[in-house]
């Protein structure tokens, strides 16, 4: 059984959206990449853990990485359409990007109320573990799923994948023939990547 979902990443420039997409896609980190113009699109299939070995379940994600630069913001709302899940990304330790996450959330709510939202604090590798717990989520975003990650080290991406899986309703899974099964499967139960905290 497989579900196909559209995932869109939102957030200001330089918070690490493209690095998150790269980590989701390939499990790698690229230190240098060009700024996203408009939007970029990739696909990824996640295998859903199940206690029933006779039933294989997968989630095929169509992931849209949107531009965060001011001059491209007018183009971003077109990618909200039919999005099942939005990852609203901010940079840990950057209060201004967290405040801007509220603006992204409000714009999404105005245009696509049915979209599920996950708040993602990126660049965990740049802050100490004890300081990462000091993040105060704005009232407008409280109650939404939240996860702190590091696209650089891979920290907590297993948790992010599990949250994504939890937001996909059972009714969205469809039975496919073997000829339609997708490759490129991510085993989310792999040992999480190690990460260190350098202060």
UniProtKB/Swiss-Prot annotation:
Protein name according to UniProt: GTP-binding protein YPT10
Record family assignment: Belongs to the small GTPase superfamily. Rab family.
Residues with lipidation of kind S-geranylgeranyl cysteine: 197, 199
InterPro entries xrefs: P-loop_NTPase, Rab, Small_GTP-bd, Small_GTPase
Record-linked Gene3D superfamilies: P-loop containing nucleotide triphosphate hydrolases
Gene Ontology molecular function terms on file: enzyme regulator activity; GTP binding; GTPase activity; guanyl nucleotide binding
Function: Protein transport. Probably involved in vesicular traffic. Specifically binds guanine nucleotides. In its GTP-bound active form may be involved in recruiting the MON1-CCZ1 complex to membranes enriched in phosphatidylinositol 3-phosphate (PtdIns[3]P) or other charged lipids, leading to recruitment of YPT7 and downstream effectors involved in endolysosomal maturation.
Other noteworthy facts: Present with 1360 molecules/cell in log phase SD medium.
GO cellular component terms given for this protein: cytoplasm; endomembrane system; fungal-type vacuole membrane; plasma membrane; vesicle
Family annotation (SMART domains): RAB, RAN, RAS, RHO
Modified residues (Cysteine methyl ester): 199
Subunit text: Interacts (via C-terminus) with GDI1/RabGDI. Interacts with YIF1, YIP3, YIP4 and YIP5. Interacts with CCZ1 and MON1; interaction is stronger for the GTP-associated form than the GDP-associated form.
One GO term of the biological process aspect: endocytosis
Keywords: Cell membrane, GTP-binding, Lipoprotein, Membrane, Methylation, Nucleotide-binding, Prenylation, Protein transport, Transport
Residues where GTP binds: 11-18, 65-69, 122-125
Organism, as annotated: Saccharomyces cerevisiae (strain ATCC 204508 / S288c) (Baker's yeast)
Compartment(s) where it occurs, according to its Swiss-Prot or TrEMBL record: Cell membrane; Vesicle
Membrane topology: Lipid-anchor
